[in-house]
Design a protein with these regions (language model features):
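N-terminal, intrinsically disordered, small/polar-rich Type III/flagellar export signal
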Residues: 1-181
Length: 181
């Protein structure tokens, strides 16, 4: 007979037992859920508003003490925004079609349209750093494609605003604190 694992509330977590499991009881207390980072742009009048062209580069990593450390498991992703897809909607579509580890959506907040970029993966090591090569020649001003730069490290330029911080889940199993993406 094998050992089975059960949990009192299967909506909170899943459990399993290996053949080497020893019968017993454990406590699980969930402190916080893992979150993926979400960033929003300034407002645009319409989804057809021309923003700019160039290249968006998305990197994943961890921000700590004013420094960005790359996530070695994820390569940087570059997305070319051509003049033909340089509207707000075109940029959203180009980001989504690139399958670059993020999703892009447009939210109407009542005062305009905002581009929202979200990491597909949760955890502090999946925070975003977005840089541009902007066709207007200035890669960090608040016009053209550089309206979508984000670098929360010391001295970095961020024209996007963070709405949800990348965070790990934290929980306690039998009195032991654990943090996981």
């Amino acid at each position: 007979n094998g050992i089975t694992a059960t949990i009192s509330d299967s909506t909170l977590a899943s459990v399993s037992a290996t053949p080497a499991a020893i019968a017993g009881s454990h406590s699980l207390e969930i402190q916080t859920l893992a979150q993926s980072q979400k960033l929003k742009s300034a407002n645009f009048a319409t989804t057809n508003t021309t923003v700019g062209s160039g290249t968006l580069t998305i990197q994943f990593g961890t921000y700590s003490s004013g420094t960005f450390t790359l996530n070695a498991d994820k390569a940087a992703q570059s997305i070319v925004i051509s003049p033909s897809n340089s509207s707000l909607a075109g940029i959203r579509d180009a980001i989504n079609q690139a399958d670059a580890g993020v999703t892009a959506s447009i939210v109407n907040d009542g005062s305009g349209k905002r581009l929202v970029i979200a990491s597909k993966d949760t955890g502090v090591s999946n925070a975003l750093k977005i840089t541009t090569i902007d066709s207007d020649g200035n890669n960090s001003d608040n016009t053209g494609l550089s309206q979508f730069v984000y670098d929360a490290s010391t001295g970095g330029v961020s024209n996007l605003a963070e709405t949800v911080a990348a965070s790990n889940a934290s929980f306690i199993i039998d009195g032991i604190s654990i943090s996981k993406a």
